[in-house]
Curated annotation (Swiss-Prot):
Keywords: ATP-binding, Cytoplasm, DNA damage, DNA recombination, DNA repair, DNA-binding, Hydrolase, Nucleotide-binding
Single GO biological process annotation from the record: DNA repair
This protein's name: Holliday junction branch migration complex subunit RuvB
Example of a GO cellular component annotation carried by this entry: Holliday junction resolvase complex
Pfam family, one: RuvB_N
Reaction(s) the record says it catalyses: ATP + H2O = ADP + phosphate + H(+)
UniProt-annotated stretches for the region Small ATPAse domain (RuvB-S): 166-236
Natural source organism: Mycoplasmopsis synoviae (strain 53)
Oligomer status and interactors: Homohexamer. Forms an RuvA(8)-RuvB(12)-Holliday junction (HJ) complex. HJ DNA is sandwiched between 2 RuvA tetramers; dsDNA enters through RuvA and exits via RuvB. An RuvB hexamer assembles on each DNA strand where it exits the tetramer. Each RuvB hexamer is contacted by two RuvA subunits (via domain III) on 2 adjacent RuvB subunits; this complex drives branch migration. In the full resolvosome a probable DNA-RuvA(4)-RuvB(12)-RuvC(2) complex forms which resolves the HJ.
């Protein structure tokens, strides 16, 4: 059995303030018989943004349309989607920052007034046409909110940041997931598994599935500390759930540049990773764990980062 997404607010773990606000918005829109305001979710990948959009659709009993931002390249792409929706439908655009920048402003009137302003014909024969669309709710999700234009962000009635999950949240997610997977993982292992998840629900669910795989194949279905460690070793995971990419980054700062500040451009060139990958995928957990620091001169490994490498026997 696969782990399924939560389907209502009660089964969604964490993000309490965010959910409290969403509940109030939904209840208010029902009482006023108004379309739900547009909502923008932002935060790290795997935190539950898509799941929560689905829950909003369930709670409002409205249809949801899932779209990838990168697939919206032309005005016609937007028209094709928004011209066929029903009143109060939800349009969820994942990675909304990746919509073609040339059509973003075309979306503004659709969000504010539920219309499209079109120009039909060319030059002297051009005519302005206003096309009405049915009231809808746009829910956007992004891992790169800084790439969104301020006027675009201003058109969302609620902008919500997904905060890091705490230890208790992660243990509850594990508790729920092992029931769905029908695996016998003792509570004494919850903290250890959670510590490798980088406090991310999607990651912990993937880890549980792989632990289950190894237990079935290597240990007659029995999950103990030994098989969990074997799983993590096979996945090339280190303490705190760091990957080889994280470790190579730390090693480069420590050994390649004698623990001196290094520019992002230099790191990108040596590690052969785009700067965006370093900033959005590798550095966040290292900064959160205080294994690195950012200075005006560049990135530096911290004393805690050096201690981490020594503890993991990654430097001598």
């Amino acid at each position: 059995m696969q782990i399924t997404r939560p389907h209502n607010f009660e089964t969604f773990i964490g993000q309490k303030n965010l959910i409290s606000t969403l509940k109030a918005m939904i209840e208010s829109s029902k009482k006023q018989n108004k379309v739900l305001n547009h909502i923008l979710f932002y935060g790290m990948p795997g935190m539950g943004k898509t799941s929560l959009a689905g829950i909003i659709a369930n709670e409002t009993k409205n249809k949801i349309h899932f779209i990838q931002g990168s697939n919206l390249e032309k005005k016609s792409d937007l028209i094709n989607i928004l011209s066929v929706i029903n009143e109060n439908d939800i349009v969820f655009i994942d990675e909304i920052h990746s919509i073609n920048k040339n059509i973003i402003e075309f979306l503004y009137s659709a969000m504010e007034d539920f219309v499209f302003d079109l120009i039909i014909g060319t030059e002297s024969n051009a005519k302005a046409l206003r096309m009405k669309i049915k009231p809808f709710t746009l829910i956007g999700a992004t891992t790169k909110i800084n790439e969104m234009a301020q006027p675009f962000k201003d058109r969302f009635g609620y902008i919500a940041r997904f905060v890091s999950y705490n230890a208790e949240d992660m243990k509850q997610i594990i508790r729920n997931s092992i029931k769905l997977l029908n695996i016998n993982l003792g509570e004494e292992h919850f903290d250890f598994v959670a510590s490798y998840s980088r406090n991310t629900p999607r990651i912990v669910n993937h880890l549980l599935e792989r632990i289950n795989d190894f237990a079935i194949v290597k240990n007659a279905g029995i999950i103990d500390k030994k098989i969990i460690k074997k799983t993590f070793k096979s996945l090339d995971l280190y303490e705190y759930g760091l990957t080889k990419d994280h470790v190579e980054y730390l090693q480069l700062l420590r050994d390649g540049f004698d623990s001196k500040p290094v520019s992002l451009d230099t790191l990108s060139g040596v590690l052969i990773h785009p700067k965006e990958v370093l900033v959005n995928e590798i550095e966040p957990i290292l900064l959160y764990l205080k294994l690195i620091t950012k200075t005006s001169k560049g990135r530096m490994i911290s004393s805690k980062g050096i201690t981490y490498l020594l503890k993991e026997k990654l430097i001598w």
